[in-house]
Amino acid sequence: CLVNPRACNETLLNYNPTDNPKSVAVVGAGPAGLAYATVAAERGHRVTLFDASAEVGGQFNLAKQVPGKEEFHETIRYYKKQLEKLGVNVKLNTRVDADTIAAGNFDHTMVATGIVPRQPNIPGIDHPMVMGYIDAINGTRPIGKKVAVIGAGGIGFDVTDTITHDGPSAAVDIDVFAKEWGVDFENHPRGGVTGVEPVVAKADREVWLMQRKETKVGRGLGKTTGWTHRL
């Protein structure tokens, strides 16, 4: 499971109550920080969770905006409820330094600050027309009609899917789902499959997805239903 390491390991990984409660600081409220904070609190430790942003979730807040991945909203909702239920002291809009940790007199500090987007050292990378994936997914900057996406890994595919999609996502709109997959819920044809070409709402944009490897694009992606949609 993406968020529950105990799934299928219930007899191997147990969160037993601690005999020696500690004061714990967790820096970063992304997936790793949320998991650590909730488990530590569940075991009986006193946990303070810091994050520089205004909400918990880290890069899950990007993932939930990708068409078909809206279920990450529920993951974040679950963790918010767990933080409240377990009494974790959450401090948002807070940048942490050594003085912050020292002032809190914590017994342990867990650093879960995630990653910094890689910026390749190539000519023109600082041009105003160039943006990172965070701006592209959040829609904080305008995106042109012709786009080159450098990198064909999971993030490259997510960015491409996001900027080429138009309208509601099939994951949250039944009518859109039926059109994209060519399904007739009235079961007029056999099996409920309409027999027509699926209709996918596409943005008026051309995208070139680039990678350095000579292998087929997408070959390194996990073989899961999350990547079954053809761009």
Language-model region placement:
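N-terminal Rossmann-like dinucleotide/flavin-binding domain of flavoprotein oxidoreductases
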Residues: 58-106, 218-231
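Iron-sulfur cluster-binding cysteine motifs and their immediate structural context
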Residues: 2-6, 48-55, 61, 121
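N-terminal Rossmann-like NAD(P) cofactor-binding module of classical short-chain dehydrogenase/reductase
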Residues: 110
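Rossmann-like dinucleotide/flavin-binding elements
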Residues: 18-52, 91-102, 113-122, 126, ...
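Generic secondary-structure signature for well-ordered alpha-helical cores
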Residues: 3-6, 84, 88, 168
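A short, flexible beta-alpha/helix-coil linker loop
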Residues: 8, 62, 213-217
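Cysteine-cluster motifs in flexible loop/terminal segments that predominantly coordinate metals
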Residues: 1-21
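Gly/Ser-rich helix-loop-strand patches that form or flank binding pockets
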Residues: 130
